[in-house]
Amino acid sequence: TIDNNKFVAITGPNGGGKTTLAKAIMGLVPATGGQILWNGQDITKLSITERAKLGISYGFQQPPRFKGLRVRDLLALASGNRNLSRDECCSYLNRVGLCAADYVDREMDTSLSGGEVKRIEIATILARPSGLLIFDEPEAGIDLWSFAKLTETFRLLQSKGKNTILVISHQERIIDLADEIVMLSNGQIARHGTKEEIMPNILADTGGVCSFLQPGGNNCRQSKEG
């Protein structure tokens, strides 16, 4: 159970089920058992579109591209406001570390790098009125400067207290923002609590083979077994 308006980080070793859990909440993969409740409503059998209408948004690890669609058009579609102003579009792009003037009229095609597409997708999530924001490794493919802008955006969202934020991440700086941490291992919840309760136990629960937390980069500390 996740309380409203909380920032929750889901972490754990690779293959632990983090992305599968997030996709099941969004309806991208079917739940194999139990129920998924959103504000007391059973959404287990609802379609992706129906869940989106209820205010659930999802950011992919590898966002899709849309040839022929401009960035500003995508933001307008996401927001539900076809008349979204240029200034409003630029505001969302600036919040994810993009120079808005360089991107607002560009097409969502192969001319954009993976990191650029990732940041634009996060901007569309911010533009969409949502009660639950799900981000699957939002730091993937993002440079250090943009990563700082991303964490700043998460801090701002958290301070407003208007959304429940669910982030899958290995980045310690993102996890440190969370009100609660859920650690998954082998498809099971190994730990769930505040960061003060969970952080000291993370390495012990993973057996110390390799730390999946990444303080700044993508380096992984190798154990004696390595």
How does the language model describe each region?
Residues 188-213:
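Conserved beta-strand-loop-alpha-helix hinge in the C-terminal portion
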Residues 137-138:
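Walker B catalytic motif
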Residues 62, 68-85:
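Q-loop/switch helix immediately C-terminal to the Walker
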Residues 34-41, 54, 88:
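Conserved ABC transporter NBD signature motif
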Residues 11-13:
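The feature captures the beta-strand-to-loop junction immediately N-terminal to the Walker
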Residues 42-57, 202:
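ABC ATPase NBD coupling module
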Residues 125-126:
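ABC ATPase C-loop
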Residues 26:
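Helix-to-loop junction immediately C-terminal to a conserved catalytic motif
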